[in-house]
């Protein structure tokens, strides 16, 4: 349900899973991300932190925590969690891309493009995402950006 954008259904399904098994770290993680995407980042943080308490080695939850912090506007904390993903999974495309978007949002153009280039080297499909997302809108006249994404 989460991958199709049906956040309410994802929240319902994971809440049912948690009722069946209160120690289901994956369910807390997914519910936290879905809840944050649905607009309640405070509850989203609480659920992803609970998932971390239950399973501190769940790398997928690190990513979800990074995204929830990003949605909350806590960019340094978000970057820290993307970096934790990369410690365990150095070629995690969307964590590399996530760091690129944070640098873009913070106005550090050189680092944003360096990280974007790394993400594209891992997975060229990143080009089309970067070309369309708001994070990089102001880069559309930047020669290096145009070369990287093929604009």
Model-derived regions: residue spans:
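Register position in tetratricopeptide repeats
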Residues: 3-4, 37-38, 71-72, 105, ...
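Canonical positions in the second alpha-helix
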Residues: 16-17, 50-51, 84-85, 118-119
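Terminal, low-structured helical/coil segments at or just beyond the last alpha-helical repeat
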Residues: 121-151
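Canonical tetratricopeptide repeat
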Residues: 30, 64, 98, 132-133
């Amino acid at each position: 349900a989460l991958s199709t954008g049906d956040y309410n259904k994802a929240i319902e399904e994971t809440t049912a899973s948690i009722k069946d098994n209160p120690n289901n770290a994956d369910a807390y993680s997914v519910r936290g991300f879905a809840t944050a995407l649905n607009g309640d980042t405070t509850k989203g943080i609480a659920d992803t932190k609970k998932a971390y308490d239950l399973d501190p080695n769940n790398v997928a939850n690190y990513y979800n925590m990074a995204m929830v912090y990003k949605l909350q506007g806590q960019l340094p904390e978000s970057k820290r969690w993307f970096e934790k993903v990369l410690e365990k999974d150095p070629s995690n495309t969307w964590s590399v891309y996530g760091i690129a978007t944070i640098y873009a949002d913070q106005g550090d153009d050189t680092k944003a493009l360096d990280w974007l280039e790394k993400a594209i080297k891992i997975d060229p499909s990143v080009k089309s995402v970067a070309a369309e997302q708001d994070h990089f809108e102001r880069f559309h006249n930047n020669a290096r950006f145009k070369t990287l994404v093929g604009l």
